[in-house]
Amino acid sequence: MVNYPHKISSQKRQAPPSQTKNFANRGMSFEKMINATNDYYLSHGLAVIHKKPTPIQIVRVDYPQRSRAKIVEAYFRQASTTDYSGVYDGYYIDFEAKETRQKHAIPMKNFHHHQIQHMEQVLAQRGICFVLLHFASQQETYLLPAVDLIRFYHQDKGQKSMPLGYIRENGYRIELGAFPQIPYLDIIKEHLLGGKTR
């Protein structure tokens, strides 16, 4: 192997190993943006909103070495409700976040009956409840109030997806920014609270 100036090797470059597609964390970039937004709100004293942990029951753990324990069998203890909850200006906040690669709709299979029931219960207690929807292929993000999701869920049970047109008509578009990345509190304050705070 000969090194040329600027440390360029004469050896043929090997192609990087092919990567298999992993769809498990398909929504992670959107989730990371929400988490960064929530961190911003927390550090600036605007809101305290956290991601809810998923309740998991660990069944079996392998200990090949004491420092390398590996969970090999686990299951969900109970169905989780929504992704995030917290407090903003004395109001309870509860919301779900969904990302899709589809251009014109969000699949309704992403919303489970127990989640709809939970949202109904939050609204019955006068909490603020909504869904953040991100259309990755179009880079469009919306806040859809829970009442509109629930109405669609009950009226159109046979439909497999919620059209983007319905979301645009009933939701609020969020322009993505730098700090915070997803300024959803602006929508809550202006549209869901009518500009007033406590």
Curated annotation (Swiss-Prot):
GO BP: any one term: DNA repair
Cellular component annotations (GO), alphabetically ordered: cytoplasm
Record-linked InterPro entries: Resolv_RecU, Restrct_endonuc-II-like, tRNA_endonuc-like_dom_sf
Cofactor(s), names only, from the UniProt record: Mg(2+)
Cofactor note: Binds 1 Mg(2+) ion per subunit.
Single GO molecular function: endonuclease activity
Keyword terms: Cytoplasm, DNA damage, DNA recombination, DNA repair, Endonuclease, Hydrolase, Magnesium, Metal-binding, Nuclease
EC identifiers of the protein: 3.1.21.10
Subcellular location field: Cytoplasm
Positions with a binding annotation for Mg(2+): 81, 83, 96, 115
Region (Disordered): 1-23
Enzyme class, UniProt record, top EC level: hydrolase
Disulphide bridges, residue numbers: none
Biased composition (Polar residues): 11-23
UniProt catalytic activity: Endonucleolytic cleavage at a junction such as a reciprocal single-stranded crossover between two homologous DNA duplexes (Holliday junction)
Signal sequence, start to end: none
Family: Belongs to the RecU family.
Function comment: Endonuclease that resolves Holliday junction intermediates in genetic recombination. Cleaves mobile four-strand junctions by introducing symmetrical nicks in paired strands. Promotes annealing of linear ssDNA with homologous dsDNA. Required for DNA repair, homologous recombination and chromosome segregation.
Protein name: Holliday junction resolvase RecU
Organism whose genome encodes this protein: Streptococcus oralis
Gene (name only): recU
